[in-house]
Structure formats: C-alpha cells, structure tokens
Amino acid sequence: MGINQSDSCYLTPVPHEQRRSPTTMGLLWITMTTAFPAVLIGFEWHKQGFSFSQILFCSVLGCIFLLAYAIPASLLGAKSGLGYCGLSRVVFGRWGTRLVAANLIWMSVVWYGIFAVLMAQAVNDLLQVHYSMTVMAIIFGLLMAFNNFFGFAGIANFARFIAAPVLIAWVGYTFFKTINMVPHAALFEPSHQPMMTALTVTSSFVIGFAVWGNEPDYWRYSKPCSLRIAIPMVIALLIGQVIFPITGWLISQTTGITNSDTATAFLNNYSFAGFAIIGLFVLAASYFATNDSILFGSDAALETIWPMKHKTAIIILAMVGAVTAAIFSVNDSIKTLSVITDLSCIFLPVPTVIMITEWWLREKFFRLPIDFANVPALIELPAIDWPAIIALLAGFVVGTVTSGWIPGLESLHVGICSIQAWLTSAFIYTVLRVREYRMETVGQALIPEITEQATESILIEP
C-alpha cells in the first residue's frame, strides 16, 4: 500500500521522523474509501424506491456518524504510533487479542474476495466478453496479492496519484453532466419507502463500505493532528459516500437502468465514448489498490498473532481470498456487497470502539496514560480481559440482531445496526471497566493497612 512493512515492527510505535505528510496520508485515505461500487449501489437504491432527498440526507448522516468513530480511531493510531493489534493487547488480554485479530482477518478476506469478483465483473461488462466469472475471480484474487508479496510501492503510488484522481474525475464529470439532465421535479418526488427504512439501508451501507475497523494500522504513519486527519476524511466521504451513490441514482433515474452490469458499461460509454480500455484501466488500478490495503492490514493481524514469514502470510491470505471470490462469483455481486457492508459496520469497528473507550477513560478519568512505547508480549497478558470481551460480544450480538439478517428477527431490524452495536459496546465497557478500576483502587488502598495489621499481629505474638 505504499508504506513498507519493514519501516517498523507491527508492535513498535512508528518514529515521528518516519511519519508521512498530510498530503500522502490524505491521498491514501481517499484511495481507500472512494471506490466504484459506491456508484453501483446508487442504481440499487433507485431500484428499491428511495428518493433523492432520502439518499442525500441519509448518506450525509451516515458520514457524520462514521466521522464520529473514524477520527478518534485514526487519532489513536497517530498518537500512539501503534497499529490495531498492538493497541488490542492493551485492552483485550491474550485470548481476546487473538479473537480480535481473527475477526479482522475473516472480514478482510471477505472484502478481498468481493473486490476480486467486482474486478472480474468489470472485465466482462466493459469488454463485452463472457469469460467464466469464477475463473477470473480466482485469477484476480491471486494477482491482487502481487504488490504485497514483492513489496513494490509503484502500484499503490500509481493508484493514489493517478487512478484515484481519474476515477473521481470520471464520476464527478458524470455527476455534473447528469444532474443537469434530470428534471428538477424528479429530485423532489416523494419516496415509496419510509424514511426509517432509507436510514437503515443507506446509512448502514455508507458506514459499512467506508469503515475499515483497523484505521490505526494506517494512521499510525501520520503525524498526530486532528485537523490533518479530519480534512481528508471529510473530503473522501463527501466524494465516495455522497457524490458517488447519488451519481448512480441520477443515472438510474434518467435511463431506467437498475442492473449493475449494464450500469458499468453505460458509464463507460457515457464518459469515455466507448473506449472500454480506459474505464477498465481506472477500475483495475482502484480495485487492486484497495485489495492491496486490505492485505496490508490483515497481514499485520496474522503475523503479530501467529508469527510467520511475510510471504507465507500473503500466500495464505491470497489463496483464502481467491477461494472466497470463487464462492461469491456465483451470486449477485451488489447484493453480496450489501450483506458484507451490513456485517462490516458491526464486526470491524466494535473492537476499535472499545480501544477508544479505554483510551478515553485513562486520559479523562483514571489519569493513567497508556505506555505506548512498551507493548507487552502475549505471554505477559492476562488470559482474558472480561470487561472488554463482554462488551465486544454484546456489541456483536446487538448489531447482528438488529441488522435484519437473522431469520425470524426481521421485526428487530430498526435503526442503524452499527451505531447500536457501537453504543452498546462502549456503554458496557465503560460500566465494567470503571467498576474494575474502583475495585483495583480499593484493593491497592487496603494493602498498606493489611500489611500493618499483619506486622502488628506478628509483633504481639509471644
């Protein structure tokens, strides 16, 4: 992803002199959160009957919720210089750290697989060929590991400085071209869906698609400044999670297209006059760069929990990702993407929310700053940190139950499942952690008194 893993150990804070500039980090994050599938989901939302005003309002609201999480998560990485797995050791204990790492790995593999499928789909749609989706998805799943395997920075740099700006310019040009063609009355038409349904579906996608969960893995390379983190995040979300899906909705409104395959081909003809190779080139760079970043984070989790050679870890992750892509290739890619975003907005951020809560409690209430310079080895950790594990599982349960994906519990599909999961985990962890801290404080206060009483009893004995 353009940041060499040899720069520093995963469990050692990144030195300040090795931190990247705001421009580099900003371009990196924009590349990671502005992707073409966000345009395709706009077609799906139009098909489901959501109005323009609903899409606009719910997308912006979802971005605000996401920023409330992502800025503290990224700032924690920048202040500590540590990544996701290093920070998790401070909070979750030995087995909890393994659980958190495994959680990140399986979700990353799922994302890796769907982007390989989307790349295969782009080839078929733009070149108007009918190659086997399964075979192509497997091939791309393996090829997308090339950059991480050999440690080249050129592909990621090309994606940041060329492909991402071209993709943004492509969608931006389409947005301004289309919005002038849509009758103003269409922008204010009433919706066929309740506002709460629109909020649940739209905001969950925005959060699930743009959240990474392991933001500290990337922002540990940034200088600790809230403004330097917030500005690129706001820009990235405005482009990738507001303008991109609205563009898809506008085109669907204008053309009546609802199928993602047809939509990709139409966008290429609409913007590049049918030069398919240009659109394919831009999408390939974007998808390859995204999976490059996904592998970077999942490799960090795998290597810090189960030590192995870097290339061995990449081979394992790429092969599992390719198999996952093969499984996804036989299903509707947009529906699969929607399911993944619903799961992602729950399972990826909840552990980080707990880490943020611990950091906040230590800074504001306990007055016990974390020693980021010394990350304990796994063997030095307690087996289980119960407050963190209970809060983690509670967040997972609440988010999953309210996501609407469990048969028989559709009636509980209300609100934004991710926000409910985050608030649950933060609240439960705060209550349990404060209780634990008070018990520890009382215990430490009693030690001198107990020692004094024991000494007196010894002296009194004949």
Located regions from the model:
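Membrane-interface "cap" regions at the ends of multi-pass membrane proteins
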Residues: 1-52, 195-202, 213, 219-227, ...
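Hydrophobic, membrane-embedded alpha-helices of multi-pass small-molecule transporters
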Residues: 20-39, 174-180, 188-251, 272-292, ...
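Membrane-water interface regions at transmembrane-helix termini and the short interhelical loops
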Residues: 46-49, 74-75, 118-128, 140-162, ...
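Juxtamembrane transmembrane-helix boundary signature
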Residues: 59-92, 99-107, 429-441
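Hydrophobic transmembrane alpha-helices that form the core helical bundles
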Residues: 97-129, 284-304
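Transmembrane alpha-helical segments of multi-pass small-molecule transport proteins
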Residues: 101-105, 126-150, 164-175, 197-213, ...
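Membrane-interface loop-to-helix entry segments
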Residues: 120, 135, 139-177, 189-192, ...
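C-terminal membrane-solvent junction of multi-pass transporters and transport-like membrane proteins
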Residues: 352-428, 442-450
